[in-house]
Regions:
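N-terminal accessory targeting/assembly segments
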Residues: 1-188, 193-197, 208, 568
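Long, charge-dense accessory insertions within large macromolecular proteins
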Residues: 167-223, 293-296, 300, 318-324, ...
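N-terminal pre-Walker A segment at the start of P-loop NTPase domains
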Residues: 209-244, 279, 287-292, 296-303, ...
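Glycine-rich phosphate-binding P-loop
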Residues: 243-275
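Flexible beta-alpha connector loops of hexameric P-loop NTPases
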Residues: 310-332, 364-379
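Conserved alpha-helical scaffold flanking the Walker A/P-loop in AAA+ ATPase domains
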Residues: 330-342
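Conserved P-loop NTPase nucleotide-binding/switch module
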Residues: 342-386, 390-391, 403-409, 413-430
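Conserved NTP phosphate-binding and transfer environment spanning the P-loop NTPase/kinase superfamily
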Residues: 391-394, 400-568
Length: 568
């Protein structure tokens, strides 16, 4: 049942100056001019987490042309733009209503540089119906209702913001068309990668360095990227037209150079190139195949029966590496597990930086092989497997190295970053490498790994159990005080992705883990559900949290694999 806005105002007058819990009587939906306002959740007191409300606008009234949301990528870009615009409008009214605690707060997601699907704004792909989800601190004096201040928010502030930020007729049509065009061009580039046998594309003129270690905005006066002529590719984009940049081919690409010359900066841009970026970011035309996974050592991580025998065998403690278990993995075993788990997600591109890798996992030079006999070393280093992965499995690698030249022998393409500019030194490096002994690649006797891990549902997640889950920024998720450490998942771009990972862990534990299907099968099913319904699968009682951003399936896998309570 939908009530009128006057019904809401009358109710607010009736409960004015009552104890704060009386605000719960306002839950429901109310028709305002041009939209429906739903009060979905009411906070318990003015100092608790804010109340959740949603705004619903019919597509015919919102008036956005179908061309602006004709594809999923365009729709997500439009939603992202609407959130930004609405956030700018409500910021003017934030805490204008007064009271105790969180009284007067009006807040919505604040998107960063990446364009992510978010629960804060969803648009129906069929009819353009629009839903905005936000948080409001219901005002109080102490713990007594101050409904006059809430009336200001709901009847004075929000209607102005809705009118100015959510109806097409009041927005800059040219700006929205630019958002659509960029999304279409980015999608075109992503599809061209496969067609041209490329792993990534970096447009000339891109600005890769960021403003600071705590800011993802582009560095002012950053040196624009220029492709080496030998790797230049020109794409004819649907809207931008011809665009030239560096195409990184499939295979093994090595990025070398002196310290501070831009090696890691390029790799960092590539690892976040799995997402589209907003115009003006400097990386809007840095596009990496979207299944790429950044690999690193992760000392101390939990590993639950992952088959790492592709890299590690015959451990002196007789641990079974075909089903390796550890609550405190070493650098090499953690990096081996990270590679295998990335391949389990279906990734065909591994991104590796020497600085964050376990040396004994990456290389083993000739002198060490002479001193420590091969049959005394349980680790088969990555350098001995990387060519087989590329040639036999179609799995490419992009590696950054600054201290060891061992990978010159196996690399297909070698780039040197020189004062932030890439130089193709493949021929020169290969010739120089001839004077040094090469490491012989080795092919495995069978498949890369056995991915038949069957997950048992954890009783702690049963609806009748008291479950304490808490998201701790970008670092971790606490499950009954047991932390899932996410600090090494460098491709997570937004805190709201962590919120979504927390909700998705609950979802798979309660609905998908059945003690019969493998993790791979369950993740395939989850991926299909997310592709079809998006974050709506996480709605409870018809209500979707306003602070979720879509993670990739690769990060969902990674989160589950790091859950120490995982039962296999």
């Amino acid at each position: 049942m939908i009530n009128t806005s006057q019904d809401l105002k009358d109710l607010l007058f009736r409960i004015n100056r009552k104890r704060y819990p009386a605000y719960k009587d306002t839950k429901g939906s109310y028709r305002f001019p041009g939209y429906v306002l739903s009060i979905d959740h009411v906070q318990g007191d003015p100092f608790a987490a804010p109340s959740k409300i949603s705004l619903h606008i019919k597509g015919a009234q919102a008036g956005f042309p179908e061309s602006l949301y004709a594809t999923r990528e365009m729709r997500i870009a439009l939603q992202n733009q609407l959130i930004r615009g609405f956030a700018a409008h409500i910021e003017k009214y934030n805490f204008r209503a007064k009271g105790s605690g969180k009284s007067g707060l009006i807040a919505i997601s604040k998107p960063g540089q990446e364009i992510l699907e978010r629960s804060a704004c969803t648009m129906d792909a069929k009819n353009g119906d629009l839903t905005i989800r936000l948080e409001v601190g219901f005002p109080a004096n102490g713990r007594t209702i101050n409904s006059g201040e809430l009336i200001k928010i709901l009847f004075d502030f929000l209607p102005v913001c809705v009118k100015d930020a959510l109806f097409y007729r009041n927005l800059d049509a040219r700006k929205l068309e630019q958002v659509r065009a960029l999304a279409e061009d980015q999608t075109f580039i992503r599809k061209e990668l496969a067609a041209r046998n490329l792993t990534a594309f970096v447009a000339n003129g891109s600005v890769l360095p960021r403003e600071s270690g705590v800011s993802s905005r582009p560095m002012k006066n950053g040196i624009p990227f220029v492709s080496p002529d030998s790797m230049a590719v020109t794409l004819d984009l649907p809207n931008h037209g011809p665009l030239t940049g560096m195409g990184i081919p499939c295979g093994i690409t090595l990025i070398v150079g002196g310290g501070y010359h831009g090696k890691s900066t390029l790799l960092e841009a590539l690892e976040l190139g799995v997402y589209n970026h907003i115009a003006g970011d400097g990386r809007e035309y840095v596009i990496t195949r979207d299944d790429a996974v950044k690999i690193r050592a992760e000392d101390g991580r939990s590993i639950k029966h992952t088959d790492i025998s592709f890299f590690i065998n015959d451990l002196p403690n007789h641990k079974d590496t075909h089903s390796f278990y550890s609550e405190d993995a070493s650098g090499s075993t953690s990096q081996a597990a990270n590679v295998i788990e990335a391949l389990e997600t279906g990734s065909h591109l591994l991104l590796i930086d020497e600085d964050t890798s376990a040396t004994n996992f990456m290389i083993r030079d000739e002198l060490m092989q002479r001193v420590v006999n091969r049959n005394q070393e349980p680790i088969t280093p990555f350098i001995e497997r990387v060519q087989w992965l590329s040639d036999a499995q179609g799995i490419s690698s992009i590696l950054v190295a600054g201290s060891s030249g061992s990978y010159f022998h196996v690399a297909d393409t070698i780039l040197q970053m020189d004062h932030y500019k890439p130089v193709d030194i493949t021929a020169f490096a290969k010739k120089e490498a001839e004077a040094f002994p090469s490491i012989q690649p080795s092919a495995p006797s069978g498949a890369v790994a056995d991915y038949r891990r069957v997950i048992q549902p954890d009783p702690a997640f049963r609806p009748d159990r008291r479950l304490k889950m808490k998201v701790l920024g970008m670092d971790s998720i606490s499950v009954n005080h047991d932390a899932i450490d996410l600090r090494c998942l460098e491709q997570l771009a937004d805190p709201e992705q962590i919120q979504a990972l927390s909700a998705l862990l609950c979802y798979v534990e309660r609905r998908l883990f059945n003690g019969k299907d493998t993790l791979h099968q369950i993740m395939d099913q989850l991926d299909k559900e997310l592709s079809t319904r998006g974050l709506e699968i996480l709605s409870e009682g018809g209500r979707l949290a306003p602070n979720l951003a879509m993670p990739r399936i690769q990060e969902v896998y990674a989160c589950i694999n790091r859950f120490r309570g995982l039962k296999i």
